[in-house]
């Protein structure tokens, strides 16, 4: 029993540290949402997060995600499903052009995955143009649906 409590305390400290490294004040709800996002193996919609935290105030969850996005803890993905998805950024991510990567959207199960090992190639833009975000989504069947 003591070991479990110690592990939970260490986990909370790690989550709080991850928030603080992004200049995000730690609150119980922010820690819970961060923990939830870490446990997911794919990007999730606001609706999925609301379903996971049914008793939480919806506006609090929305503001939490917007705070995470503003401080580069998560990035958003428009995968064409008409539901914006949220995924954790890598700890080293600064959401610059070099950090942009492809996403894979399964057209069967509707899950969206970050392909962080596939960076978007640098594109030469016209003079005085600056890329803020690239939305590159590959669609097909994920490993589970392709069986």
Sequence positions of predicted segments:
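Short amphipathic alpha-helical elements of helix-turn-helix/winged-helix folds
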Residues: 18, 35-40
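Short, basic interhelical loop/turn and adjoining N-cap
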Residues: 55-59
């Amino acid at each position: 029993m003591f070991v479990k409590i110690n592990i939970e305390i260490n986990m909370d400290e790690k989550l709080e540290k991850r928030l603080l490294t992004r200049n995000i004040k730690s609150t119980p709800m922010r820690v819970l949402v961060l923990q939830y996002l870490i446990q997911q193996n794919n990007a999730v919609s606001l609706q999925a997060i609301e379903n996971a935290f049914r008793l939480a105030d919806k506006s609090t969850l929305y503001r939490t995600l917007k705070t995470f996005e503003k401080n580069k803890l998560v990035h958003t993905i428009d995968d064409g499903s008409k539901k914006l998805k949220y995924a954790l950024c890598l700890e080293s991510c600064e959401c610059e052009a070099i950090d942009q990567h492809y996403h894979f959207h399964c057209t069967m199960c509707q899950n969206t995955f970050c392909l962080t090992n596939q960076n978007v190639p640098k594109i030469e833009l016209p003079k005085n143009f600056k890329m803020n975000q690239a939305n590159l989504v590959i669609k097909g069947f994920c490993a589970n649906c392709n069986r």
